[in-house]
Amino acid sequence: MIFHAFLIKYAEIAIKGKNRYIFEDALVKQMNIALSKIEGEFEVKKEQGRIYVFCPEQYDYDETVDALQHVFGIVGICPVVIYEEQGFEQMAKDVVSYMKNCHPNYNGSFKVYTRRAKKSYPITSMEVSAELGGRILDEFPDASVDVHDPELTLSVEIRDKIYVYSQTIKGAGGMPIGTNGKAMLLLSGGIDSPVAGYMIAKRGVKIDAVYFHAPPYTSERAKQK
């Protein structure tokens, strides 16, 4: 299955109120830095309360996911398949095709969650979810619907195109680097200082590391360490 984009989920940033855009912009900046090291032209966009990474036609999926997993501020990465918006019947066919490709022979519980960002769409979110769920059951008779605690949540977002995803890959969490001041980190040569640096960086602090080497009192082995 070829994924055309990634939906980026974040947690703490969402409660920042009127300052939320500052944290979102910082997260987008860090994502662009991480993705710039990968071959291909990626586009990171904020759209109606969401952050998406739009991928080039040819890209390394595993390398892209790994880069995003190391960006503080991201709690979840959802691989997205994008379909053209050509009416409900075509959307239903596309969603069933997605299930057949990503979850062949599925026999567990599921629910369809629809988000209608395109408010001009003539069918409500609940109606879309119910109808799509029925179409999926027709193709997967051993599956069952559970709207409270499903094993699989199939998300459908109706925008200018149809965005479909069902997987969330765990991110690093925390806050984007640069949103909570700066700090100096003294690297002592042990494991404690880099761990402390990682933990404070995860809270959005920009770290500058310092190491003191004082020969002959500091051995070459300690320097290498």
Protein language model regions, located:
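RNA-binding accessory domains that recognize and position tRNA/RNA substrates
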Residues: 1-184, 194-224
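Conserved G/P- and acidic residue-centered "switch" motifs that form tight phosphate/ATP-binding loops
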Residues: 190
